[in-house]
Design a protein with these regions (language model features):
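Membrane-embedded alpha-helices of multi-pass transport/permease systems
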Residues: 153-156, 160, 226-234
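Final/C-terminal transmembrane alpha-helix of multipass membrane proteins
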Residues: 256-272
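Re-entrant/interfacial helical elements at transmembrane boundaries that shape
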Residues: 162-163, 233-238, 261, 266
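Juxtamembrane boundary at the C-terminal end of a transmembrane helix
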Residues: 269-281
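Hydrophobic transmembrane alpha-helical segments of multi-pass transport and channel proteins
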Residues: 218-226, 253-261
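Interfacial helix-loop-helix junctions of multi-pass membrane proteins
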Residues: 230-246
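Membrane-interface alpha-helices at helix entry/exit sites of multi-pass transporters
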Residues: 170-183, 243-257
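Membrane-embedded alpha-helical bundles of polytopic integral membrane proteins
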Residues: 1-218
């Protein structure tokens, strides 16, 4: 526990620093680095770490995508990011299919689907952090919610489950998670988003739609826990405890950012509804 706390004391200020400089190239560079490490972790777990025909294109796809939304000129606004994402995903998909066809008998289609899906999940998840920052009104504030939601949910799900947990959630996937913990994490995520709204309203003078914030908190709590369970399922199927050890006490990038990736995609999608997710203006 001490190791986890000490690591968190380093990670949180580092994250704040990344968000503070989100108007610079340091922001997409940070996500590109983490995306590359996450790809390394996933390919190592799948036993394809040295399969260069698959891993190198995956690295290029995941590392390059966060830059697709960065406004490299004053006239650019990240508007081409979605098109770049779709085109890159299509090219990578066709490449994986081609490798599958030419490796008949040694590379099953089911394994190809797993490789493609995992890579797409990582690449789009980290790219969504850039898409939100550069392509959404007040994106810098929305980026805060991407991290607040999953980490509040995870923290309070742990403590609620520890003190009140009686019923297992999905023991086959994650034996320690409980229904009570899941509910507690969800409630505190909603509360956390409401508190965020109060700070924005009374501290910075924004107009806040608290109903929208509450709905967002509910959806984020659910989707972040799904992301966590997906990552846990992959680990259980491969018989590992953590994806890596880059973050002492927390594991690897995929251990720490599994729920952040699903949340970033969700909040980016919500921001596209009706021309903007109007919770703050």
């Amino acid at each position: 526990m001490l190791k986890r706390v000490l690591t968190a004391c380093v990670l949180i200020p580092l994250l704040v620093l990344i968000l503070f400089f989100s108007h610079t190239l340091a922001y997409p560079i940070a996500w590109a680095i983490l995306a590359g490490i996450a790809i390394f972790e996933i390919f190592r777990v799948n036993g394809r770490g040295r399969d260069w025909l698959l891993s190198i294109p995956a690295y290029l796809f995941a590392v390059g995508l966060p830059f697709g939304f960065y406004p490299f000129s004053e006239s650019a606004s990240g508007g081409y990011g979605a098109k770049i994402t779709f085109a890159a995903a299509l090219v990578y998909f066709l490449w994986v299919i081609a490798v599958t066809v030419f490796r008949r008998g040694t590379f099953a289609f089911s394994e190809a689907a797993t490789v493609f899906t995992a890579t797409l999940y990582i690449a789009v998840g980290f790219a969504a952090l850039s898409a939100i920052r550069y392509g959404v009104a007040l994106g810098a504030y929305l980026c805060l919610l991407v991290f607040i939601g999953p980490w509040v949910t995870d923290t309070f799900a742990y403590f609620t489950g520890r003190f009140f947990g009686r019923h297992k959630l999905i023991p086959e996937v994650s034996p320690k998670k409980t229904v009570e913990g899941s509910v507690g994490g969800t409630v505190f995520c909603i509360v956390g988003y409401i508190v965020f709204g109060l700070v924005m309203q009374f501290g910075y003078g924004f107009t806040v739609n608290y109903a929208m914030l509450a709905v967002a908190g509910l959806l984020v709590a659910v989707i972040s826990q799904i992301g966590d369970l997906i990552a846990s399922l992959i680990k259980r199927e491969h018989g590992i405890k953590d994806y890596g050890n880059i973050f002492p006490g927390h594991g690897g990038v995929m251990d720490r950012f599994d729920s952040v990736l699903t949340t970033s995609i969700l909040l980016w999608l919500l921001a596209q509804i009706g021309g903007g997710f109007a919770f703050l203006w």
